[in-house]
Amino acid sequence: MPITKYKAAAVTSEPGWFDLEAGVVKTIDFINEAGQAECKLVAFPEVWIPGYPYWMWKVTYLQSLPMLKKYRENSLTVDSEEMRRIRRAARDNQIYVSLGFSEIDHATLYLAQVLIGPDGSVVNHRRKIKPTHVEKLVYGDGPGDTFMSVSETDIGRVGQLNCWENMNPFLKALNVSCGEQVHIAAWPVYPGRERQVAPDPATNYADPASDLVTPEYAIETGAWTLAPFQRLSVEGLKKNTPEGVEPETDPSVYNGHARIYRPDGSLVVKPDKDFDGLLFVDIDLNETHLTKVLADFAGHYMRPDLIRLLVDTRRKELITEADPVGTIATYTTRHRLGLDKPLDGEKKEKEATKGRDSEAEEL
C-alpha cells in the first residue's frame, strides 16, 4: 500500500564542477538535509555529478579537449565506492534519491539517472536515449534495457527523464501508460532568454523548459512534477571556460529556473535568482484523481485500437551469432554493472544471522 501523503524536495544548486569527490560530498549533504526535513524523496538535476559541461555549447573542439579529459576522469561508475556512499546516505536517511550523473561505462559516457530506494538498493537505472545536439560529442545513446523510467514504489509510481526527454511525446506516452504519479524532470544548467541571440530558437533556453515544457508535462500526464536545476556562480563560470578564453561575469541568467508543479500544471514553488538549496513540496497522490478523471491517456481518454506505441526494451549485443541456431549468452546492463547485488553484502549478513538463529534453536 503506497504512502499517499509525504514531503519531497528538488535540488537547485551549483554542482561540484568536474570534481567527483566534491560532487559526492555535496550530494550526501543534500540527502542528509532532505532526510532531516523528513522528506521521502529528493531529486537532483541532470548530470549533477560532476556537473553539466555547458562549455561544450560555447567552445571549439580543440578548446574542449582538456576539459573533456577532466570531465571523463571525474565521471561516476555505478559499481563504485562513490556510488555506494550515496546509496548508504539514502539508506541512512530512509529516503528515495533520484540522482542524475555522467556515467562512465567502459570508455563511453552516458547521461544517466538512478532511483535509489530507502534501503540503499538501486530501484531503477536509466540512460538518456539520445544526447541533445552537441551533447553527442560527449555522451553516447542509452541502450534498450536502460530507458524505462517509471518505478513502482511505496511512495507511488515514480518516473525520471533528462532534459529534452521531458518534451518527447513518445516518452511521455510511455510514462503515462505506466501510470506515473510523480515525475522528476531533471534539467542541467543553461541560460534564460535574456541571452537569446537570433536565429537560435527559444527552445534552447531555460525559461521555456521551466515555464512551458515542465508544467505541460504535469498537465499531460496528471503527475506531480519536480524540476531540479543546476545553478552557476562567477567561480562556476570560470570553471566552465577553457584556458585562453575570457569567462562570462554575470551568472544570474543561469539561475532561478527550478520548479515544482501540481498534477494540473499549477505552480507550487519557484526560487529567487540567488536561492541555492532545496525546494519542498507536500505531495498528495490522491490529488491525481482530479486530473485523471478528466484526462487519463492510459485509460478512458485513449484509443489503443487506433493508436499504439511500439517499445523495445531488449539490449542489442555488440556481438551476435550469425548462425540462427547458435546462441551467445546475453545479459542485462543492470546485471553486468552489478546493480542487482545487495549493498555492502547485506544478503550475506542476513544469511549469517539466519544461520546463527538456527544454531540457537538447535541448542
From Swiss-Prot:
Disulfide bonds: none annotated. Residues 338-363 are annotated as: Disordered. It catalyses: formamide = hydrogen cyanide + H2O. Its EC number is 4.2.1.66. Induction: By cyanide or metal-complexed cyanide complexes K(2)Ni(CN)(4) and K(4)Fe(CN)(6). SUPFAM superfamilies: Carbon-nitrogen hydrolase. One of its GO terms (molecular function) is nitrilase activity. GO terms for biological process: cyanide catabolic process. The keyword Nucleotide-binding does not apply. Gene3D superfamilies: Carbon-nitrogen hydrolase (3.60.110.10). The keyword Lyase applies. InterPro entries: C-N_Hydrolase, C-N_Hydrolase_sf, CN_hydrolase, Nitrilase/CN_hydratase_CS, Nitrilases_CHs. Optimum pH is 7.5. The active site is at 46 (proton acceptor), 128, 163 (nucleophile). Keywords: Hydrolase, Lyase. Residues 6-285 form the CN hydrolase domain. HAMAP family: CN_hydrolase. Belongs to the carbon-nitrogen hydrolase superfamily. Nitrilase family. Catalyzes the hydration of cyanide to formamide. Degradation of cyanide may be important for plant pathogenic fungi in infection of cyanogenic plants. Also able to transform metal cyanides. Oligomer of dimers, forming left-handed helical fibers. This is Cyanide hydratase. It comes from Fusarium solani.
